[in-house]
A protein has these predicted regions:
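Functional-site microenvironments in short loops/helix caps that host divalent-cation chemistry
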Residues: 4, 8-10, 14-16, 20, ...
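A short N-terminal beta-strand-loop micro-motif at the entrance of redox/enzyme domains
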Residues: 27-35
Length: 282
């Protein structure tokens, strides 16, 4: 874990590149106390240790199905895609048997992906792991402070240039979403957790690769009333915050692979592009 000293920073953005409906602004000052944050997302290997120690069953395992990106379906799951596509988001399919052990559905596995971020985990699953590990999920403010890596009001953990010196610095969709991915950044799906260079705080893949669960309930109007010191989000809600974007993000569809971008999902949801990392209090 990396120790972050906290302090005051400017959270949010008011630029024309964001999504007003997500409530990315207004920019406001936040003050955080010090905390420790995992340098990487929780890996398949780490989650496997948790499951072996506790016998925990994820929500996807209990439900018997989960969501898989259409381009990643295992051969057996691909046969079901016509009847399982999500209306309005046809690149997602509801697949029976898709779990953290079989992320793309029956026939897929994680045997060569122990160092990849665990996916197909819900907010509740992430909370269970964090409690077992003696940690917790980061607040949205802690996450953004960490992602910025000490930079002030920059779009990415390294600055404002998406590809500085022509080099890819994160795992996002390259090509024409959702049908053509050139893999110019070296990856088609999730990348190992220490891919690309760490940010100024020694944290890896804070943007791109997989979305990351945060503690907070999601409210697009929250920044207008959020307290200055150690905010923890609204008291109630229907969806939990997720941050960072994923390998499925593209400028034409989901320009949320930024330090200030916000999104959300229901706490029982699990997908092939959603993971988490943990915080420990100082």
């Amino acid at each position: 874990m990396q120790r972050l000293e906290g302090g005051e920073f400017l959270m949010g953005n008011e630029g024309d590149y964001g999504f007003p409906a997500d409530g990315e602004g207004p920019v406001h000052a936040v003050v955080l106390t010090p905390f420790y944050l995992d340098a990487t997302c929780v890996t398949n290997e780490q989650f496997n240790a948790f499951v072996n120690a506790t016998g925990y069953k994820t929500e996807a395992e209990r439900f018997g199905w989960s969501f898989v990106f259409v381009g990643h379906l295992s051969p057996s799951a691909a046969r079901e895609r016509a009847r399982s596509r999500v209306v309005g988001s046809e690149w997602w399919c509801r697949i029976d048997g898709a779990t953290w052990r079989h992320p793309e559905g029956p026939g897929s596995n994680i045997k060569k992906r122990w160092g990849h971020p665990v996916v197909q985990v819900s907010w509740s699953d992430a909370m269970a792991y964090a409690a077992w590990a003696g940690k917790r999920l980061p607040t949205e403010a802690e996450w953004e402070f960490a992602a910025r890596g000490g930079l002030v009001q920059k779009r990415f953990p390294w600055g404002d240039d998406l590809e500085p010196e022509g080099r890819h610095r994160m795992n996002v969709w390259q090509g024409v979403f959702p049908n053509v991915n050139t893999e110019a950044d070296g990856h088609y799906g999730p990348a190992p957790v220490k891919s690309y260079r760490a940010n100024g705080y020694g944290l890896y893949n804070m943007t791109g690769n997989v979305w990351e669960w945060c503690w907070d309930w999601f409210d697009p109007g929250w920044y207008r009333t959020s307290p200055r010191d150690d905010p923890t989000g609204p008291d109630r809600g229907e969806r939990r915050v997720m941050r960072g974007g994923s390998y499925l993000c593209h400028a034409s569809y989901c320009n949320r692979y930024r330090t200030d971008a916000r999104s959300s999902n229901t706490p029982d949801s699990a997908t092939t592009n959603l993971g988490f990392r943990c915080v420990r209090d100082v």
